[in-house]
């Protein structure tokens, strides 16, 4: 995708300064035995970061001469160990993925350790990330996700189990977490300390609490505080909508890199911009609608290649609104695109889009994906907050549970 070069920083002075400073901000990112040229990680997102989407983002990054880390959808340790078919079906990798990266979720150290062993031994995974950031009630009510770091001892046991299992294969383990449960129950500094003591290669921090969900603004100051608190690399996450945001986060916080989630929805070319930005080039890809429809075709094509045409087209439907955000495509056409069942049908509908329509620059920097409102409370196991050292009442995760944080 060529797109049109654009100084993405025109929205405000901070963005403009970040884009205009044409300096190399990073020499890449090293996580144990894994190294990438661009210090950027694609966050695992349920139903999004399958092999097809990871391949699409990888193509964009490499087109700009960069390499990033693209993480598979989150899977559960119990599902993997017990041979759950849905879990196993998610562990599909594209032929171009030199570094196989998977996010693992679990609340039982034994299961997490065994699942890590399976990933390394049976699937050739080169990087394992552990999820301690998911804020959704179905996870936190079991003591998992963003709730688990409150139990410091349990967190340490899980991390050590994964690091020990992965260490036999020289595979680095990282963790992703949030600031805490709510402002009164913060966990991220202790989590960073425990991660470092456990031999974790890096910690990614989403600058929101569980009670915030995806609402409000991410607190980048918390990322800076964590950077000062630990000696292992810290990756910043939250409110990275443009490449300029990533540069600004690294500059303001001292983070070793960034984790990008919702910002790339319907915009896989963001990884091209990120590769350029961290190499010192002030560019932003502004594709015409014709170029966007080419990207949409490529995305659907990859989905069909990995899943078959019927399922691939169904999986593509959710992406239509993200790709067309801000463009003038009519509601009837959008609706039809969101119901496609074959590639031929998709191509016929894409042909109806006006190819010369310019990119809607008004949406640059705007949030994408789910946002919502803060939760009234975080659902936790009974008595969860009574102590920080005991296990409390951890409820075992469902074998086929999938979500993200």
Locate the predicted segments by residue.
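Alpha/beta catalytic cores of nucleotide-metabolism and tRNA/nucleoside-modifying enzymes
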Residues: 2-36, 40, 46, 164, ...
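Glycine-rich, positively charged N-terminal anion/phosphate-binding segment
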Residues: 20-30, 45-122
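N-terminal small/glycine-rich loop or linker at the start of catalytic domains
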Residues: 32-41, 78-99, 134-144, 167-179
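Active-site mouth loops of central-metabolism enzymes
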Residues: 39-49, 99-112, 149, 175-188
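Hydrophobic faces of well-ordered beta-strands that scaffold small-molecule active sites
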Residues: 40-44, 70-72, 100-104, 128, ...
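Active-site beta-loop-alpha junctions enriched in small/polar residues
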Residues: 45-47, 75-77, 105-107, 133-135, ...
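Alpha/beta enzyme core
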Residues: 59-65, 113-144, 148, 152-232
